[in-house]
Amino acid sequence: MCSSDLFNERNLKFTSWAVGKALELNPAAGRAMAESGHEVASHGYRWINYKDFTLEQELDHIRKAFSAIEKSAGKPPVGWYTGRFGKNTLKAVVQHGGILYSSDSYNDDLPYWVKVEATPHLVIPYTLEVNDMKFAVPPGFSQGDGWLQAMTDAFDILYAEGARSPKMMSVGIHCRLAGRPSRAATLARFLDYVASKPKVWVATREQIARHWMKVHPAK
């Protein structure tokens, strides 16, 4: 099954990192996610390493990614996560405009503001700690039990700390990995565990960004 079905069945929303070229080839995917109320954010135009791209080359790919997502999902993205970013990525994202936040950062647990050429920009950090990609790279998860233990341990610590101050947990999942039957069962158990706890907000990154901008605006 596709892991998105597990979210839809529980009326939970997620952020999808969509590669622009992929949506050009399969526009129905973006449409289906948008119609289900999920956020379709950008994962770049191509699944390539951008380290050697010039600023203008990155801007060109950002424009193409925006166009592909808007045509597929019905509106342009407000979130950006290249993953294979280069030295010009953040500057290009801010110069292009229209992006509320980016996530090419792994250095904090909460959103924070940076200035890019004097322009305030919100960063919502990402994490690979409990990412299902660890099923595909060593050393990682070999069975669903290990993934479930890692997710619940991380959640429990953050939930306890959240009684004193805000906390955020990110879980990266991929249909080709977490969508496998045994792993989908693990994800379902984790979603049910999270849903059983009071005062937990399962939010898209756009929702987090808008909340942070309202409560903690750039100074």
List each language-model region with its residue ranges.
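Positively charged, amphipathic and often flexible ligand-engagement surfaces
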Residues: 124-146
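Active-site-proximal beta-alpha loop/turn segments in soluble metabolic enzymes
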Residues: 133-136, 172-176
